[in-house]
């Protein structure tokens, strides 16, 4: 199965100007359009750009708004190129509801005061109209954000009187980092709105934090939820071929170590040939289900009468769902749809998203271990994950193969998706460090995590936010992207 390819977001761009300037200052309009093209070329590295060019009249503003709507843009970057009246900006956003980001990117860090004329100044006065734009947008009840800094050209254009080579300067680098974070946030939102999430089986009985209204989830994230039954999966087993199974076996051998018996847990042993064969078959079946139903993610769990055929089938889920997760089909156990969404968010921007919960606190090391009995995101593993044969899944029916692994050492982000008393989704975001600490050999994923807070202080802050008990673990510090994503989606968030 090939890895999921995510679509690029579509970003709108236009530059502001005052029509009266063009006759007064020949060449100014062309110079500002050069800056506009520079911004477009930078944006195009990570998104599809719909560039309207220069907006300098009310009529063009209305036309631009309609055009951006036709283009279905996720964000509109408003390049404040020079002074312009707010009357030539507000109509754009009254005609198109996409998120507004004002770009105040000055070309030069300092004017050549002795040689600067009015045209030179006007090419650098992008900050001048931003308060006016902000006031008009606010009074029209249109939300906006502003990015301030330097434009970031790598060389000074000919006939320019001030030095505009600013790509090396922190004010340019910070501005473009923020711009790219908004693009990543738009990538998340646009892909979620096109995603189909499977819900297979049911939610673990009694885990009240996991229960959420399917309609609410679609309304607030844009995902479509396909309700699936275990018989939908079982029916596909008849179509699994020996070559399908052989392919899964080869992938598994490449990705995993087959662990020996655990030295500490008698229930965690080296997987038997029979256990592996069953897991390979079920993994091939799971891939067929994903392909047949066009799934982008999956929440799953099954609990039925002891010893029935579906129980045997679900006992072998973890390997296949770990392989799917590595290919961009985020899979969350225990029927946790909200955490499946959080995992998908992480995978969309290439930072993993592994299914986790609190495992135990190591007070001597100052860490909290996070993990689960699976599935695991293999792409972000520290070394090769191990497969163990489990005599029992704690708290669940059945037995089979589980994954023992840890997330690679370095910066990580935990992303929780919970639900408030008002029925609104809420993100809880924590940046931390994955350490090279010890873990148990019990056939579960575990990662020792050190926060800037003492473990008890972190728990104090986390538990006050009423989280779900699962979360997605991603590599890298991604809070700035996830907060922007929450703003785009209109959902609450809290950074701890």
Residue ranges: model-predicted function:
Residues 33-57, 143-149, 223-228:
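Short beta-strand elements in bilobed, periplasmic/extracellular small-molecule ligand-binding domains
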Residues 4, 8-11, 111-245, 249, ...:
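Cap/lid and interdomain-hinge subdomains that line or gate substrate/regulatory clefts
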Residues 322-441:
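C-terminal catalytic subdomain
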């Amino acid at each position: 199965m090939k890895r999921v390819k995510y679509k690029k977001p579509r970003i709108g761009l236009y530059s502001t100007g005052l029509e009266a300037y063009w006759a007064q200052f020949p060449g100014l309009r062309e110079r500002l359009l050069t800056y506009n093209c520079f911004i477009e070329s930078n944006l195009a590295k990570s998104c599809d750009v719909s560039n309207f060019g220069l907006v300098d009249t009310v009529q063009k503003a209305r036309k631009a708004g309609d055009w951006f709507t036709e283009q279905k843009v996720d964000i509109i970057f408003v390049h404040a190129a020079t002074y312009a009246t707010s009357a030539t900006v507000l109509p754009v956003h009254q005609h198109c509801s996409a998120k507004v980001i004002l770009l105040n990117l000055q070309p030069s860090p300092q004017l050549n005061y002795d040689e600067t004329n009015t045209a030179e100044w006007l090419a650098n006065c992008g900050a001048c109209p931003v308060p006016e734009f902000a006031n008009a947008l606010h009074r029209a009840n249109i939300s906006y954000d502003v990015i301030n800094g330097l434009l970031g050209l790598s060389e000074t254009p000919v006939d320019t009187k001030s030095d505009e080579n600013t790509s090396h300067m922190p004010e340019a680098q910070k501005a473009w980092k923020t711009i790219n974070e908004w693009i990543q946030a738009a990538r998340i939102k646009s892909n979620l709105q096109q995603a189909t999430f499977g819900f297979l089986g049911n939610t673990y009985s009694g885990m009240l934090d996991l229960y959420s209204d399917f309609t609410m989830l679609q309304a607030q994230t844009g995902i479509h939820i396909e309700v699936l039954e275990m018989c939908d999966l079982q029916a596909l087993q008849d179509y699994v071929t020996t070559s399908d199974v052989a392919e899964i076996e080869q992938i598994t051998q490449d990705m995993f170590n087959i662990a020996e018996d655990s030295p500490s847990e008698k229930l965690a042993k080296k997987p038997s040939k029979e256990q592996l064969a069953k897991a390979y078959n079920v993994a091939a079946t799971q891939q067929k289900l994903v392909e047949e139903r066009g799934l982008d993610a999956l929440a799953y769990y099954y609990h039925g009468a002891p010893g029935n055929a579906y129980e045997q089938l679900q006992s072998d889920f973890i390997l296949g769902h770990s392989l799917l997760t590595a290919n961009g089909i985020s899979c969350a156990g225990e029927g946790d749809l909200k955490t499946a969404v959080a995992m998908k968010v992480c995978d969309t921007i290439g930072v993993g998203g592994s299914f986790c919960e609190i495992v135990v606190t190591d007070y001597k090391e100052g860490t909290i271990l996070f993990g689960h009995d699976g599935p695991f995101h293999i792409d972000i593993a520290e070394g090769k994950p191990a497969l163990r044969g489990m005599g029992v899944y704690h708290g669940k029916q059945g037995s089979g193969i589980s994954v023992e692994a840890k997330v690679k050492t370095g910066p990580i982000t935990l992303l929780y998706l919970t639900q408030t008393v008002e029925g609104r989704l809420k993100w809880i975001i924590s940046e931390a460090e994955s350490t090279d600490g010890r873990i148990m050999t019990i056939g579960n994923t575990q990662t020792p995590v050190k926060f800037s807070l003492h473990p008890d202080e972190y728990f104090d802050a986390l538990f006050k936010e009423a989280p779900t008990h699962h979360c997605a673990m991603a590599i890298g510090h991604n809070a700035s992207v996830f907060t922007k994503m929450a703003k785009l989606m209109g959902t609450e968030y809290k950074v701890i």
